[in-house]
Amino acid sequence: MNLQLFLLLIVVVTALAFDFTNGFHDTGNAMATSIASGALAPRVAVALSAVLNLIGAFLSTAVAATIAKGLIDANLVTLELVFAGLVGGIVWNLLTWLLGIPSSSSHALIGGIVGATIAAVGLRGVIWSGVVSKVIVPAVVAALLATLVGAVGTWLVYRTTRGVAEKRTERGFRRGQIGSASLVSLAHGTNDAQKTMGVIFLALMSYGAVSTTASVPPLWVIVSCAVAMAAGTYLGGWRIIRTLGKGLVEIKPPQGMAAESSSAAVILLSAHFGYALSTTQVATGSVLGSGVGKPGAEVRWGVAGRMVVAWLVTLPLAGLVGAFTYGLVHFIGGYPGAILGFALLWLTATAIWLRSRRAPIDHTNVNADWEGNLTAGLEAGAQPLADQRPPVPAPPAPTPPPNHRAPQFGVTTRNAP
């Protein structure tokens, strides 16, 4: 096996690993509000989302073409560069998942690839007009638009249902949430699975397996990316789901349906035009809008502020990881460089996963009350069962003998004659 084929295999495996992390990182985009409001049981929600993500991945390839051709010069791409960009995306996805921050997988991937490209060939390798017009501008506009649509939709829902019994409206909206959440999952598969298709497409162009003039990825690329994302989605990104469903706003069924409907509309529209949109930012904007639009709702602006900071630093920090990885792999070179880069990625992923086990979040505690941060109040539940022993009861007080009277202070007692 020659070095280039070896690198291609590593790139394909790493790309599918990124797709897997994208699946569990972004499950909350579709299902967080349905889980938080009780419309769907947690495990049922992620299973439904996995199936619809799988179907959605086959519906379009416009975004894949954007990733493959619209952001960097395909003629300057090497397999080392693509691998380094994927490492940047995976590491950022895992870090934000650990912290429960719903940041953009799309921007992590794009940032990693752009950073690796700059490290490899300089600024000339990046199509800056494409980055601005296809990534940055749509992200800002879509997040603001989703917030506005979510707020207006929520306000209209509560305005329309004034005077109707709350129990009746919530039951109806819970049913509606199943449909709207399904639509968001379908939209997520349509938009996000294509990004990994585009990366593998780019690697195949670099290797020479497909023409640089090709416009559609091979069928095996589409199928493998769809399956990887569906598998990741089925595991459920419980940490992200908790932040979106409980940390930002206390979601009620009418808010959940309004948020999901606005998310689906914006995501599907962007996928149709080939924009590499962040579904996370759209979903978060919609949830935030649902809090703003409901009279008297509480929005946790501190949590929202941390999310915005994460969004702002995603592109540059993922780019730094991508650039560092490219420099390391390229400096060592050959098989040792590729193997070392791959090994460091998996060691980093393992360390992050082990850290998350200190306070695990899953379907059993994802809806626990929010007590200030992601894991507050959950640490006790993370202890092994052997450590959760019930308290030992105090021994009972001794029973006094018959005819015994306890002495009273200040009273002199005499023995009977």
Swiss-Prot record:
Keywords: Cell membrane, Membrane, Phosphate transport, Symport, Transmembrane, Transmembrane helix, Transport
Composition bias type Pro residues, residue spans: 390-404
Transmembrane segments: 5-25, 44-64, 81-101, 108-128, 135-155, 218-238, 301-321, 327-347
GO MF term list: phosphate transmembrane transporter activity; symporter activity
Membrane topology listed for this record: Multi-pass membrane protein
GO BP annotations listed: phosphate ion transmembrane transport
Subcellular location, record wording: Cell membrane
Task performed by this protein: Low-affinity inorganic phosphate transporter.
Protein name: Probable low-affinity inorganic phosphate transporter
Gene from which this protein is expressed: pit
